[in-house]
Regions:
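Short, charged alpha-helical interaction segments and adjacent helix-coil junctions
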Residues: 2-14, 82-87, 174-297
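Conserved single-residue anchors adjacent to enzymatic active/cofactor-binding motifs
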Residues: 1-208, 225
Length: 297
């Protein structure tokens, strides 16, 4: 069986489930009722209505700032903001990402000139396929609490919640257990997961979405290849530089008690190993002309 990175874009599309970022975004934005139900399920809150969800909403505070995209960004009728992120790999910077995302949501929710008291309640939700914190919990729900007295809450209206899908069987409710079973690609038995399965199947019959997915995958492969080539060049240059520095250090240590003949002998050894005359000259202290003479002799 092929590893995920070995699959072609077409094979990835065939195997894609709701846990795939692209499929998740399309299903949620095309079905606001299911997005609303998912939020209520995850957060155990009641939502009267939501605006049409936005897939991969782009945020950029100013020209020089780092631009990012939210997977699914939605607001409800009271102005509360929700960002739902699918995280398929185990990354160590999720807490900082959540902090950054929450700040951007605050900027987005405040119209120009508005008072800070008008900041809306905001939720950053990560659906992680692996344990983001390694403590074996099914859910990590963070709130700002006073260090000296845990009874004192900051009540700044921000919420950061990380779900550990690998612990689907430990989720606090049956509905959550069924949803995260489905997210893991396992058989689930609930009306909600049945609806999700139908929508995922429908999404994968959409030729336009398939084309966008294939294009995105190909672009990502090109970017990864370019970055890999750039990194390989950097590493190669650093390895050459490290070797030269190591050779120079060895020569300088030995050269203190060396006669000129010994230096030339060492230079000949380097030349015999097909090391460039310029590098040999740099390491031995001989002039390039002297090294070339030795090479021709």
């Amino acid at each position: 069986m092929k590893e995920m990175h070995e699959l072609t874009p077409a094979e990835k599309w065939e195997q894609a489930t709701l846990a795939d970022n692209f499929i998740f975004c399309k299903v949620m934005t095309a079905n606001p009722d299911l997005c609303k139900e998912l939020l209520e399920l995850l957060l155990n809150i009641k939502i009267e209505r939501i605006e049409i969800p936005v897939a991969e909403r782009s945020f950029k505070v100013d020209y020089d700032s780092k631009g990012i995209r939210f997977d699914v960004y939605v607001k409800d009728g009271t102005g509360r903001c929700f960002d739902i992120e699918i995280q398929t790999t185990n990354r160590t910077n999720l807490a900082k990402r959540a902090r950054y995302y929450q700040g951007l949501m605050d900027v987005d929710s405040l119209v120009s000139g508005a008072d800070y008291s008008e900041l809306n309640e905001s939720y950053v939700i990560f659906l992680c396929m692996e344990d983001a914190f390694g403590n074996g919990l099914p859910v990590y729900d963070f709130h700002q609490v006073c260090k000296q007295d845990s009874e004192v809450l900051l009540n700044d209206g921000t919420h950061k919640v990380f779900f550990n899908a690998s612990k689907y069987d430990k989720m606090p409710t049956e509905s959550l257990r069924e949803f995260f079973k489905f997210l893991n690609g396992l058989n689930a038995a609930s009306d909600f997961t049945d609806q999700l399965e139908q929508k995922v199947r429908y999404a994968k019959t959409n030729a336009q979405w398939r084309h966008r997915f294939m294009t995105w995958e190909q672009e990502m492969r090109i970017q990864v290849k370019e970055k890999s080539e750039q990194l390989a060049k950097i590493i190669a240059n650093e390895m050459v530089e490290d070797r030269v520095n190591a050779m120079r250090a060895d020569i300088e240590k030995e050269a203190k008690g060396m006669a000129a003949e010994k230096v030339e002998e060492t230079a000949r050894k380097f030349l015999a190993e097909k090391i460039a005359p310029e590098v040999v000259a740099k390491c031995t202290g001989l002039s390039l002309e002297q090294v070339k003479k030795l090479a021709n002799g």
